[in-house]
């Protein structure tokens, strides 16, 4: 569960309504793979990840980023039950994919950076703080199966 004030919930919802999930998702996942190259081991089937340019222009990275952000978007509709919302994804990433749960936190932080880049002054310190709470809650929910 993420504890957000009504103002924080409104800020998150208002900004999210303007997010291009495909564009932001691809950019966030791409940046994760570039900045934290060890995360690429989970995406060997994606083809060329040999350079930042290759990663950022890789159609499979973009498609998976969109998928990740679509799941995140679903979570925003269930802020009071993130563990339940992400239970199956947590199980998949833990039991089958063996993803280090720290990667969820890293991706959340990268997402906040990408949102800041896309929305500039509209991404105020208050909005940023609310999104930090949300991405921390999502990362915690995704890591739940690991505990």
Curated annotation (Swiss-Prot):
SUPFAM superfamilies: Globin-like (SSF46458). Residues 3-147 form the Globin domain. Red blood cells. InterPro entries: Globin (IPR000971), Globin-like_sf (IPR009050), Globin/Proto (IPR012292), Hemoglobin_b (IPR002337), Hemoglobin_oxygen_transport (IPR050056). The modification N6-acetyllysine is found at residues 60, 83, 145. One of its GO terms (cellular component) is haptoglobin-hemoglobin complex. Coiled coil: none annotated. Heme b binds at residues 64, 93. Heterotetramer of two alpha chains and two beta chains. Involved in oxygen transport from the lung to the various peripheral tissues. Belongs to the globin family. This is Hemoglobin subunit beta-1/2. It comes from Oryctolagus cuniculus (Rabbit).
């Amino acid at each position: 569960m993420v504890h957000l004030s009504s103002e924080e919930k409104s800020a998150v919802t208002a900004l999210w309504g303007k997010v291009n999930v495909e564009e932001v998702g691809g950019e966030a996942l791409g940046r994760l793979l570039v900045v934290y190259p060890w995360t690429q081991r989970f995406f060997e089937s994606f083809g060329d990840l040999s350079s930042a340019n290759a990663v950022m222009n890789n159609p499979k990275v973009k498609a998976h980023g969109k998928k990740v952000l679509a799941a995140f978007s679903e979570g925003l509709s269930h802020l009071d039950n993130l563990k339940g919302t992400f239970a199956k994804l947590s199980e998949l990433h833990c039991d089958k994919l063996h993803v280090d749960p720290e990667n969820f936190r890293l991706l959340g932080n990268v997402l906040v950076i990408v949102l800041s880049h896309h929305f500039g002054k509209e991404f105020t310190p208050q909005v940023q703080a609310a999104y930090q709470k949300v991405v921390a809650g999502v990362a915690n929910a995704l890591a739940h199966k690991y505990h």
